[in-house]
């Protein structure tokens, strides 16, 4: 059995780490490199970086800080933000990223997934999915351009259908960003995760809602996800990654200990 992964998420805007609630009202957390060093020291398995306004601004992620991150850590990291071509992805990987993630650009052009997978291998291609539960319809819907409140909109894709589509096109890993739970710290949406797990045959990462160590345990034990991503509980030092891993190991979760 592969070890479960603990993954801090760093939303980046204008060269700084920020964090919002339900993808809105972002506050500045601090500089990228100091947080990166702290998470690596605490025992993070990998890191994910989202340049949250890149797609909405029609630009690609700033590569200068990617090189800075690669210089100071030796754990894998994934970068997302406005990647719309094979050439752009290759450049980001050349600066030191281990994986690239696409979200809104994949919705705009689903063939991008297969082109990237063909060029770099499926193990390198992550698709992020921003999913919102619409109480009126009772459905989970995929959202696009969520880094810009003025441009965020619901797409025609229902989440489970998009899950299957991106796998057909070559996604090697999925990150499910559960927008209703984001930043609220009331736990992951286990019902949605279980539904997605039934359709998802590649590694699945849960994102949105972690507030306690027990929430991570529930995601691993009850939804069988491969990794758990979180931001605010790590940024604000509510949970220490090393202590979280000790807790999970004591509960029988296969996890890499420092």
From Swiss-Prot:
<dbReference type="GO" id="GO:0016829">
    <property type="term" value="F:lyase activity"/>
</dbReference>
<comment type="similarity">
    <text>Belongs to the HisA/HisF family.</text>
</comment>
<dbReference type="InterPro" id="IPR050064">
    <property type="entry name" value="IGPS_HisA/HisF"/>
</dbReference>
<dbReference type="InterPro" id="IPR013785">
    <property type="entry name" value="Aldolase_TIM"/>
</dbReference>
<feature type="active site">
    <location>
        <position position="130"/>
    </location>
</feature>
<dbReference type="GO" id="GO:0005737">
    <property type="term" value="C:cytoplasm"/>
</dbReference>
<dbReference type="InterPro" id="IPR006062">
    <property type="entry name" value="His_biosynth"/>
</dbReference>
<comment type="pathway">
    <text>Amino-acid biosynthesis; L-histidine biosynthesis; L-histidine from 5-phospho-alpha-D-ribose 1-diphosphate: step 5/9.</text>
</comment>
<feature type="active site">
    <location>
        <position position="11"/>
    </location>
</feature>
<keyword id="KW-0028">Amino-acid biosynthesis</keyword>
<keyword id="KW-0368">Histidine biosynthesis</keyword>
<dbReference type="InterPro" id="IPR011060">
    <property type="entry name" value="RibuloseP-bd_barrel"/>
</dbReference>
<dbReference type="GO" id="GO:0000107">
    <property type="term" value="F:imidazoleglycerol-phosphate synthase activity"/>
</dbReference>
<comment type="subunit">
    <text>Heterodimer of HisH and HisF.</text>
</comment>
<keyword id="KW-0456">Lyase</keyword>
<comment type="function">
    <text>IGPS catalyzes the conversion of PRFAR and glutamine to IGP, AICAR and glutamate. The HisF subunit catalyzes the cyclization activity that produces IGP and AICAR from PRFAR using the ammonia provided by the HisH subunit.</text>
</comment>
<dbReference type="GO" id="GO:0000105">
    <property type="term" value="P:L-histidine biosynthetic process"/>
</dbReference>
<dbReference type="InterPro" id="IPR004651">
    <property type="entry name" value="HisF"/>
</dbReference>
<protein>
    <recommendedName>
        <fullName>Imidazole glycerol phosphate synthase subunit HisF</fullName>
        <ecNumber>4.3.2.10</ecNumber>
    </recommendedName>
</protein>
<dbReference type="Pfam" id="PF00977">
    <property type="entry name" value="His_biosynth"/>
</dbReference>
<keyword id="KW-0963">Cytoplasm</keyword>
